């Protein structure tokens, strides 16, 4: 654990929105009287009909969660219309293309026009309030227009990351019974085309076999590449928006009406459709965006995530736009054309706040400081990290080399299910410790418990729970509320269990130690081990598979697969490569296995349960303390696994 402390910078303290005194006061108010606290802060967004009920939540029984429930509002209105009178000509979105010579700026007035036109196209084709629209797009402004257009008319968007395979896309279309898809001819990443329309066509065929029929596909032209075309079903975006009016009144939405579904990996194979609603989500994302990033009017904010993940939803689109910020959308990757790209973009667009993932930082750190030092980065005043815990070495590099000791780092911890940031430093209030997410945001009450559910006080190491609701919290798993209750509220009764392990130090700072369930965190992306296992087992030569994570110098966690083959098959390099390709096709590049170990058998108890603890230890090249193996049906299996491990450290 890092013992270093970096006190609040004088420059940050001088112009901050929240200093330590205010943090302590507000935090106390927020946990002692959440009703009063959120009644005040709920007014940060505009309401067509103001709420009179603030908080109506319980973590027991059926876990009903309602915030501002009798208020009427609209997310699209709050992100666009309310800014037009005073800031219509301000840049809302800076788009930086994959090609460093291509970019564009979209003002709030233009954003209104694009979003209203797209909303009218959706209405023209029969999309109405409550309908699910799947968005499978690259990082282009039209992805944000699509989200905001859905929100404008009350349709529920389900954004699917453009790196997911046709099979993964189909599963998400089927689960929410989406009949309208918005996609693009091709995406571009690192100079390479990505066949999004082709993937969409394949996904629609797969979905049709499961009796979910997609009626319309709206296609944005990005590259002009050749695409298949289904007349009557497929329609061009540019043709459609030219034929509709540039105004579309926002639908008055109840605070608890659904806003979006976002699929995330569970410890079972089937992805969960995490459901977020309208009012509480927007209050929370706009508030965390303002206070965690100490956002000042007119600043340029760049979150490097993809809109296919929750970070992109909350901190590229909804949070910044609700606050009338200028938000930067980046189509490319950190190492194209070379490893200096991030820093060049910061200079080019005078970025003030930069929010990225530790994975990206570790890989850029490995490329050498010269790429950073080519740029001035003089506009930067705040740095942030998201997606996974950051190791102290990468934190120090980020602080000293990228930030030149002038920019505080907000190491933020949160999840798809939380809607927004839960634990994070505030730049003008919190002394920093490299690797620690530090203290809870307003209204967030963390608690550490041991495996039996006993509450741990003071400095301790345990499982991280949250004991009361906050407005940004997910309300359900789409179409399966029981799964929501079982996944998050049954392990420790009356508490939201995050699935993360955590340490609290003597100063009350929180240190996230990683997942305690069967979910991997690969490059900041959550991936269920069961998903990867079922992809492997779907290959005709594979009999059984077990997947665990292991420490990876760049990705944080790597994917280590133990594979047992069908009788008569033998594992070789060619099959290993074939299985890697197979998993990529089934799930997407994010799930690419790092190590595949062929094994004659897996370590199982006599009742047939795989002992993953042993597999994790071997994958970590740490088998000196495997613990009790007396319950194993065949202890000899372990010796073979150790002898043939793929991750041995060179001695």
Swiss-Prot record:
It comes from Agrobacterium fabrum (strain C58 / ATCC 33970) (Agrobacterium tumefaciens (strain C58)). Keywords: Acetylation, ATP-binding, Ligase, Magnesium, Metal-binding, Nucleotide-binding. GO terms for biological process: acetyl-CoA biosynthetic process from acetate. ATP binds at residues 387-389, 411-416, 500, 515, 526. InterPro entries: Ac_CoA_lig (IPR011904), ACAS_N (IPR032387), AMP-bd_C (IPR025110), AMP-bd_C_sf (IPR045851), AMP-binding_CS (IPR020845), AMP-dep_synth/lig_dom (IPR000873), ANL_N_sf (IPR042099). NCBIfam families: Ac_CoA_lig_AcsA (TIGR02188), PRK00174.1 (NF001208). Mg(2+) binds at residues 537, 539, 542. Its cofactor is Mg(2+). This is Acetyl-coenzyme A synthetase. Catalyzes the conversion of acetate into acetyl-CoA (AcCoA), an essential intermediate at the junction of anabolic and catabolic pathways. AcsA undergoes a two-step reaction. In the first half reaction, AcsA combines acetate with ATP to form acetyl-adenylate (AcAMP) intermediate. In the second half reaction, it can then transfer the acetyl group from AcAMP to the sulfhydryl group of CoA, forming the product AcCoA. The gene is acsA. Disulfide bonds: none annotated. The modification N6-acetyllysine is found at residue 609. It comes from the Bacteria.
């Amino acid at each position: 654990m890092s013992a270093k402390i970096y006190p609040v910078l004088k420059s940050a303290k001088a112009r901050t929105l929240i200093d330590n005194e205010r943090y302590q006061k507000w935090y106390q108010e927020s946990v002692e009287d959440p009703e009063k606290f959120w009644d005040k802060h709920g007014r940060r967004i505009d309401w067509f009909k103001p709420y009179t009920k603030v908080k109506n939540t319980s973590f027991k029984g059926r876990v009903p969660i309602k915030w501002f429930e009798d208020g009427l509002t609209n997310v699209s209105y709050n992100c666009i219309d309310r800014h037009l009178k005073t800031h219509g000509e301000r840049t809302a979105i800076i788009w930086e293309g994959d090609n460093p010579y291509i970019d564009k700026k979209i003002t709030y007035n233009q954003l209104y026009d694009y979003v209203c036109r797209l909303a009218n196209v959706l209405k023209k084709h029969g999309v109405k309030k409550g309908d699910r629209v799947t968005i499978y797009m690259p990082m282009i402004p039209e992805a944000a227009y699509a989200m905001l257009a859905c929100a404008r008319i009350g349709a529920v968007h389900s954004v699917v990351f453009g790196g997911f395979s046709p099979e993964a896309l189909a599963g998400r279309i089927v689960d929410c019974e989406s009949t309208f898809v918005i996609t693009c001819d091709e995406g571009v990443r690192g100079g390479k085309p990505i066949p999004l329309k082709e993937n969409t066509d394949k996904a629609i065929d797969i979905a049709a076999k499961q009796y979910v029929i997609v009626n319309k596909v709206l296609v944005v032209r990005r590259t002009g590449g050749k695409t298949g075309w289904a007349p009557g079903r497929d329609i061009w975006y540019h043709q459609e928006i030219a034929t509709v009016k540039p105004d579309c009144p926002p639908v008055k939405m109840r605070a608890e009406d659904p806003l979006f579904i976002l699929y995330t990996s569970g410890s079972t194979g089937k992805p969960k459709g995490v459901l977020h609603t309208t009012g509480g989500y927007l209050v929370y994302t706009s508030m965390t965006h303002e206070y965690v990033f100490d956002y000042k009017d007119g600043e340029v904010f760049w979150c490097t995530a993809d809109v296919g993940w929750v970070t992109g939803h909350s901190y590229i689109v909804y949070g910044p736009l609700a606050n009338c910020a200028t938000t930067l959308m980046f189509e490319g990757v950190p190492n194209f054309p070379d490893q200096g790209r991030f820093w060049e973009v910061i200079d080019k667009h005078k970025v003030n706040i930069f929010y990225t993932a530790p994975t990206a930082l570790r890989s850029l750190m490995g490329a050498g400081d010269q790429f950073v030092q080519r740029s001035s980065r003089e506009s930067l005043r705040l740095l942030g990290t998201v997606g996974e815990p950051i190791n102290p070495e990468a934190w120090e590099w980020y602080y000293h080399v990228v930030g030149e000791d002038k920019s505080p780092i907000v190491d933020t911890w949160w999840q798809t299910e939380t809607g927004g940031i839960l634990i994070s430093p505030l730049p003008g209030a919190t002394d920093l410790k490299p690797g620690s997410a530090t203290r809870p945001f307003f209204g967030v009450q963390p608690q550490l418990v041991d495996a039996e559910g006993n509450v741990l006080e003071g400095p301790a190491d345990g499982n991280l729970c949250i004991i009361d609701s906050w407005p940004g919290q997910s309300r359900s798993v789409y179409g399966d509320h029981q799964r929501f209750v079982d996944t998050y509220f049954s392990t420790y009764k009356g508490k939201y269990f995050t699935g993360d392990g955590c340490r609290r130090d003597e100063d009350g700072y929180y240190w996230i130690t990683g997942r305690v369930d069967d979910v991997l965190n690969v490059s900041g992306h959550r991936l269920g081990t069961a998903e990867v296992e079922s992809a492997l087992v779907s290959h005709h030569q594979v009999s059984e598979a077990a997947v665990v994570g292991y420490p990876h110098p760049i990705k944080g966690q790597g994917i280590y697969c133990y594979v047992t083959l069908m009788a008569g098959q033998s594992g070789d390099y060619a099959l290993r490569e074939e299985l890697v390709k197979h998993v990529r096709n089934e799930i997407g590049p994010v799930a690419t296995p790092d190590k595949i170990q062929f094994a004659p058998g897996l370590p199982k108890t006599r009742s047939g349960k795989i002992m993953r603890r042993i597999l994790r230890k071997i994958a970590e090249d740490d088998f000196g303390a495997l613990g009790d193996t007396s319950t194993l049906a065949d202890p000899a299996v372990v010796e073979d696994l150790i002898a043939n491990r793929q991750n041995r450290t060179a001695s």
